[in-house]
A protein has these predicted regions:
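NAD(P)+-binding Rossmann beta1-loop-alpha1 motif at the extreme N-terminus of oxidoreductases
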Residues: 1-73, 99, 104, 135, ...
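Hydrophobic beta-strand scaffold residues
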Residues: 37, 57, 126-127, 166, ...
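Rossmann-fold NAD(P) dinucleotide-binding segment
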Residues: 61-126
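Rossmann-fold dinucleotide-binding core
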Residues: 84, 107-184
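Helical "substrate-binding/catalytic lid" subdomain
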Residues: 154, 174-300
Length: 310
């Protein structure tokens, strides 16, 4: 990580690359707090959606970089980041020492460090700033941030339009490392919540009664995720995903590889990933992560059928 000596002039205009679900949440919050936004997305419908919300639009990332010095990215993964940063008419073509590029995507730390190195060749600063929080919790998000702390201080007023805090956690890649650890926890809590709800069906406990009783208690096992997953299972809310099985597989895969590369391979999260992949194989990839309940439910139904046959 190099030192950054960019401008500390007040920020009035923000660039946004990626106008999907999370990007739109950021766009709305920024504009509500008085920031102008210049948006870019490779999909015309997403660009039009941003324009309909009141944003200016850019035809290419390089053009966007010429119109604002603070740029947020919200993209699906490493391939899209590489294209936006270093592809034809990419951001790098328009970056200067006054720019701060903020990546809110969930990617692996190695990708972040490589991207930061390429961006910082221009004198610009690069921050990995993934989001801890659901779209419905916009404004309450936590942003673990890796990179130059001075650059973070400059852009924090913009970040705090959609987050409760942005915390410096280390150098390049540290923000994403923390996010991936969180995603491994998410995967495991989602799985055990789904499994227990499936077991209810076989031990004489109505799963709705179980959910309402536990979620309404002060038991140490109760978490926000259990409340969401359990409620989705009780209400058959699989087709209105807060987070899909396929996205969880992607994030957990990155986290498992990070742990393996650090010679600390995960045992529990690694096992859970097998069930995530079974869910995908059974056609549940675009459903809410609570659809893991269906995997466990079918498993126990088969076991019961075999026991009755014996």
């Amino acid at each position: 990580m190099i030192s950054w000596t960019g401008s500390n002039k007040p920020i009035e205009k923000i660039g946004l690359v990626g106008c999907g679900r999370m990007g739109r949440c950021m766009l709305r919050s920024l504009m509500d707090k008085g920031f102008q936004v210049v948006a870019y997305d490779k999909f015309p419908a997403a660009v039009q959606g941003a324009a309909d919300m009141g944003a200016e639009t850019a035809a290419a990332p390089s053009e966007l970089a010429g119109r604002t010095s603070v740029i947020l990215m919200s993209l699906p993964g490493p391939v899209q980041l590489q294209e936006v940063l270093f592809g034809a008419e990419g951001l790098k073509e328009g970056l200067t020492s006054d720019h701060v590029v903020i990546d809110t995507s969930t990617v692996d730390p190695a990708t972040t460090r490589s991207n930061a190195e390429g961006v910082e060749e221009t004198g610009a600063a690069y921050l990995d700033c993934p989001i801890l929080g659901r779209p419905s919790a916009t404004g309450k998000w936590m942003l673990p941030t890796g990179g130059n702390p001075d650059a973070l201080d400059k852009v924090k007023p913009a970040l705090l339009t959609f987050a409760s805090d942005a915390v410096h956690v280390g150098g390049h890649g540290a923000g994403n490392a923390l996010k991936l650890l969180n995603q491994l926890m998410f995967s495991c809590i989602n799985a055990i919540s789904s499994e227990v709800m499936a077991i209810c069906d076989h031990v004489g406990i109505d799963k709705e009664v179980f959910y309402n009783t536990v979620a309404g208690s002060s038991a140490a096992t109760v978490s926000g995720l259990f409340r969401e997953v359990g409620k989705s299972i009780v209400n058959d809310g699989y087709d209105t995903p807060a987070f899909t099985v396929d996205l969880l597989i992607k994030d957990a895969k990155l986290g498992l590889q990070m742990a393996k590369d650090a010679d600390a391979p995960s045992v529990i999260a690694g096992t859970v990933q097998l069930y995530n992949e079974i869910a995908h194989a059974e056609g549940l990839g675009m459903q809410d992560t609570s659809a893991l309940y269906k995997v466990f439910s079918r498993h126990y139904e088969k076991l019961c059928g075999q026991a009755q046959a014996d």
